[in-house]
Amino acid sequence: YGTGLQFFAHRHPQRFFDVGMAEQHAVTFAAGLASQGMLPVVCIYSTFLQRSYDQILHDVNLLQENVVFAIDRAGFVPADGETHQGVYDPAFLSQIGMPLYAPSNYAELTYWLHELLKDGCRGPRAIRYPRGGENARLAQYGCSGQDYDFLHRTEGAQAVLISYADEM
């Protein structure tokens, strides 16, 4: 349970399926569940999601199945080694037009996850989050629910720094 779902699995054993190291199967399985009216949430490390690109494209995206991808270990993950860096999912998911959310703190993560699970939300969509807790400095800013936030704004500044999610 590298994605931290052991508590959910224990609490909801009939709603949790561990397919092991079979990302392609996980995505196709989720597409099948979605085709029958369920709302599956597929939790996969970012670096391993690329293994299932064909299934994401053909089984989920082209059919516009109602699947939520929870992309764990997104961004730079130094402690996991060079093979586990989660840096490619924004490129290959945006290529097929899948909405991708990258909250910068826990409040935004909670907000967007609830939004993605609402009944009115349809089609494939994804939310990515880093390994571990949130950046303590960003935690003080709260969640506006907007598409962007100004974390620090100075009149007359000579430079602009743009950040994606919690990475700077």
Regions found by a protein language model. Give the residues of each.
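Thiamine diphosphate
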Residues: Y1-P124, G133-N135, G145
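All-alpha helical catalytic cores of prenyl diphosphate-utilizing isoprenoid enzymes
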Residues: I127
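Flexible inter-domain linker/hinge segments
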Residues: L138-Q140
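Long hydrophobic segments that form regular secondary structure
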Residues: C121, C143-M168
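Structural motif
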Residues: Y45, P130, S163-D166
